[in-house]
Swiss-Prot record:
Domain of life of the source: Eukaryota
Knockout or disruption consequences: Deficient mice are more resistant than wild-type littermates to lethal HSV-1 infection. In addition, USP13 deficiency impairs autophagy in lungs of aged mice.
Entry-linked SUPFAM superfamilies: Cysteine proteinases, RING/U-box, UBA-like
Protein name as annotated: Ubiquitin carboxyl-terminal hydrolase 13
Pfam families: UBA_7, UCH, zf-UBP, zf-UBP_var
Keywords: Autophagy, Cytoplasm, Hydrolase, Isopeptide bond, Metal-binding, Phosphoprotein, Protease, Repeat, Thiol protease, Ubl conjugation, Ubl conjugation pathway, Zinc, Zinc-finger
Catalyzed chemical reaction(s): Thiol-dependent hydrolysis of ester, thioester, amide, peptide and isopeptide bonds formed by the C-terminal Gly of ubiquitin (a 76-residue protein attached to proteins as an intracellular targeting signal)
Gene from which the chain derives: Usp13
One Gene Ontology term of the molecular function aspect: zinc ion binding
Free-text domain note: The UBP-type zinc finger has lost its ability to bind ubiquitin and USP13 is not activated by unanchored ubiquitin. The UBA domains mediate binding to ubiquitin.
Enzyme class: hydrolase
Length: 858
């Protein structure tokens, strides 16, 4: 029976088609239409490949099977790749509110149930506009359109699916860490916790487990002040379980993890309750051991009242307040909206995408990266980097208002707001999802995020192209045994130069002393504070402090076969193409209060560090014997190593990340963690020291019997690792060669999505295709690659640099405050302050935190 009343559009703008044909159109696609489950992420605010939204001119298309969203330019790509034909098209129409009798009324919302969770444009005054939301189903490839809501005419399953999509919450709210942080229970021991009056005071640094030498994953027992290491399986970090043993011996229930204490709280664990807990009296319990966690929490932003006025000038100078700054528009002048303490990410990404190598690697390869992206591009690093880079560089989201367009819009009574600035919400959600700090809404250290990003770029490099190579350099470390005078030269990889602040070299010491006396007097008499006097530090003094020898704690002398005093000096074994300099402004006082050196350093526009070039072993120097220190593995770790061979897929990635951030090759870090049985980064580090001279040190982990991602495909026997034919068929149906599909699946443990990533990241495959076919056909082949291990990739050159960008921080610590970025483009400085991009009039180069230099060609 023909349904009555419903009509839908026919492509080409022709007539209408009767509703009775709705069922016939949807029947072939019914198996692909899903109702979102509780764990599904439904994207209806933002395209997976661009920053298009329902506010965009073309609206947004939500796939009714994957619930991914696509702008008009990208929906066809998803249709071709997946064959999914049914999409929900979402469009928001905005009009300026008619003034008069209705003036001052609340904005008019039509179809109010459609976009309950749609983000509003913060730049628009909602009192001035009304909007109408439109939703319809679109069937590809013929673009049949069915208006929604259409309860009477659509099949029940389709109606339920549409309602579920329209009422779903944002996927970012689902993964907001505050959701689970608030669910941590209050410990039943917190109110009446017994604390021993034993005189223990905990220093702000230099901690070590009281029962072993571990210096990471340390926990402070809140009863007796013991500092002991945690268990490796608690939070995926290394430890020998001495904190748990102490609880079993003494029964003291609560411990706090050192290194997580902030004015907002800390990680507290209850051994008795066997899980994370909250302690409402944590400040008092920490104060018992000399830790004043609330010392910086006098105001909402975490600053003491006395800290506010002295810092006002810093905020004004860095943001160039009081100066009328000219807004900048167009390619390369797009801002990033602040998601709430996300300015550290925005500043780093603006600097990163001002570098041509990153522009070419991602935006330059956009069609290829997007075409070969995995089925869920929101969970792919390269796709999201490309999306962000295109958003920043295309100019598509940074357009100046044009008078003629404004007049035309007024005549049509429809407002088409220009989108200035993009929201990095999808990018931040992905790059921070495995990091406990970056995934929070708290302020973070821009330097730490920079290293985290470099690590992700390294792990997800596109074939042989790795844009982070421009930052990589080799550091030569010379360690001298003070007792025998013998030396050892080693090299390590680094990505930035950390420059100490030479406070003792201040050129205005008399002014500083006078200011400090006046400040204390004003505080004592509750008078206004004097105008801030900032220490002026010569850059040359900081450079000299970097070159000075450092004492080495716990140095093991191979000449003495025992621990001894040692001194270390560092030099550049190679100079990077781009030099990142971090000014070490942040520290902790003895009272545990985070402090920032409020200094002015005369950073040069032209930098010459050629004199810091490493020279290697000098005549007359005698090398320390090449003897490694003994590896000490705890007894419980030995038992676990003897009795259990872990699966390569279970490798503790957090320990791998810790080691990789020290500069060791990623595959070497994976092997170190694997062969030490997931016993923590400390033990794995010792393994690296022992094995780093071996020829296969940096080669991928290859375990007989496993075909994981780390295993070399050339080390497998032909039929031992044959992938299922149905998965091979899926890949070949996408246009890839069969032998290409087989090799990709063998290299990724038969994981379909990872295999597609592998194919895209190995463009050199075709050159070796004949060899792969021969290997596949020969079931008894056992060919092992004899390629030499690849050393660190560095781009050495001269030590002459010019400044092109710097990131500045305002506030007293990395846990609070604000970041902005200045970049020199087209001969002039530009300030990037979240979504605001303006020409800089007075760039505060002396107050920066991170500086980006590019090498001057010799």
């Amino acid at each position: 029976m023909q349904r009555r009343g419903a009509l839908f559009s026919v492509p080409g703008g022709g007539g209408k088609m009767a509703a009775g044909d709705l069922g016939e159109l949807l029947v072939p696609h019914m198996p692909t239409i899903r109702v979102p489950r509780s764990g599904d992420r439904v994207y209806k605010n933002e395209c997976a490949f661009s920053y298009d939204s329902p506010n965009s001119e073309g609206g947004l298309y939500v796939c009714m099977n994957t619930f991914l969203a696509f702008g008009r330019e990208h929906v066809e790509r998803h249709f071709r790749k997946t064959g999914q034909s049914v999409y929900m098209h979402l469009k928001r129409h905005m009009r300026e509110k008619v003034r008069g009798a209705s003036g001052g009324a609340l904005p008019k919302r039509r179809n109010s149930k459609i976009f309950l969770d749609l983000d509003m444009d913060d730049d628009l005054n909602s009192d001035d506009y009304e909007y109408e939301d439109e939703a319809k189903l679109v069937i590809f490839p013929d673009h049949y359109e069915i208006a929604l809501p259409n309860i009477e005419e659509l099949p029940a399953l389709v109606t339920i699916a549409c309602d579920a999509v329209l009422s779903s919450k944002s996927p970012y709210r689902k993964q907001d860490p505050d959701t689970w942080e608030n669910e941590v229970p209050v410990s039943k021991y917190a109110n009446n916790l017994v604390q021993l009056d034993n005189g223990v005071r905990i220093p702000p640094s230099g901690w070590k487990c009281a029962r072993c030498d571990l210096r990471e994953n340390l926990w402070l027992n809140l009863t007796d002040g013991s500092v002991l290491c945690g268990k490796w399986f608690f939070d995926s970090s290394g430890g020998n379980g001495h904190a748990l043993e102490h609880y079993r011996d003494m029964g003291y229930p609560l411990a706090v993890k050192l290194g997580t204490i902030t004015p907002d709280g800390a990680d507290v664990y209850s051994f008795q309750e066997e899980g994370p807990v909250s302690d409402p009296h944590l400040a008092k319990h920490l104060a018992h051991f000399g830790i004043d966690m609330l010392h910086t929490q006098g105001t909402e932003n975490g600053l003491r009242d006395n800290d506010i006025k002295p810092r006002v000038s810093e905020w004004e100078v860095i943001q160039e307040s009081g100066t009328k700054l000219k807004p900048m528009y167009g390619p390369g002048y797009t801002g990033l909206k602040n998601l709430g303490n996300s300015c550290y990410l925005s500043s780093v990404m603006q600097a990163i995408f001002s570098i041509p190598e990153f522009q070419r690697a991602y935006v330059g390869n956009l069609p290829r990266i997007f075409d070969y992206s995995p089925l869920d591009p929101t969970q792919d690093f390269n796709t999201q980097m490309t999306k962000l880079g295109h958003g920043l560089l295309s100019g598509q989201y940074s357009k100046p208002p044009v008078k003629s367009e404004l007049i035309e819009q007024v005549m049509k009574e429809e407002h088409k707001p220009q989108q200035n600035g993009i929201s990095p919400r999808m990018f931040k959600a992905f790059v921070s999802k495995s990091h406990p700090e970056f995934s929070s809404n708290r302020q973070q250290d821009a330097q730490e995020f920079f290293l985290h990003l470099v690590n992700l770029v390294e792990r997800n490099r596109i074939g042989s192209e790795n844009p982070s190579d421009v930052f990589r350099f080799l550091v030569e470390e010379r360690i001298q045994c003070c007792q025998t005078r013998k030396v050892r030269y080693t090299e390590r990889v680094d990505y930035l130069m950390q420059l100490p602040v030479a406070m003792e070299a201040a050129t205005n010491k008399d002014e500083l002393i006078t200011y400090e006396l006046m400040r204390r007097e004003a505080e004592a008499n509750r008078r206004p504070l004097p105008e801030l006097v900032r220490a002026k530090i010569p850059f040359s003094a900081c450079l000299q402090a970097f070159a000075e020898p450092d004492n080495v704690d716990d140095f093991w002398s191979s000449a003495l076969q025992a621990k001894s005093a040692g001194v270390k000096t560092s030099r550049f074994a190679s100079f990077p193409e781009y030099l990142v300099v971090q000014i070490k402004k942040f520290t902790f006082g003895l009272d545990w209060v985070p402090r920032k050196f409020d200094v002015s350093i005369d950073m040069p526009d032209l930098l010459d560090i050629s004199h810091l070039r490493a020279r290697g072993l000098q005549p007359g120097e005698e090398e320390l014997p090449d003897i490694s220190p003994p590896i000490v593995i705890p007894d419980d770790s030995k038992d676990r190593l003897m009795n259990q061979l872990i699966d390569p897929s279970d490798i503790d990635e957090s320990s791998v990340m810790q080691l990789a951030e020290m500069g060791f090759p990623l595959e070497a870090c994976r092997k170190a963690v694997y062969f030490t049985g997931n016993t923590g980064a400390e033990v794995a580090f010792n393994w690296i020291i022992v094995h780093m001279e071996e020829p296969d040190f940096a080669e991928p982990l290859a375990i007989p019997g496993y075909g994981g991602a780390g295993a070399s495909v050339f080390g497998a026997t032909g039929l031992d690792n044959q992938p299922p034919e149905e998965i091979v068929a899926i890949i070949t149906s996408m246009g890839f060669q069969r032998n290409q599909a087989v090799q990709a699946l063998q290299a990724t443990n038969h994981n379909l999505e990872r295999a597609l990533d592998w194919i895209f990241s190995h463009p050199e495959f075709e050159e070796d295709s004949d060899f792969v076919i021969e290997m596949e056909n020969n079931a008894n082949a056992n060919i092992v690659s004899e390629a030499k291990p690849e050393g660190p990739r560095v781009k050495d050159g001269s030590g002459m640099y010019e400044l092109f960008a710097f990131i500045s921080h305002m506030g007293t610590s990395t846990m609070s405050g604000h970041y902005v970025c200045h970049i020199k483009k087209e001969g002039r400085w530009v300030i990037y302050n979240d979504h605001k991009v303006c020409a800089s009039e007075r760039p505060p180069k002396d107050l920066g935190y991170m500086y980006f230099y590019r090498r001057i060609p010799s």
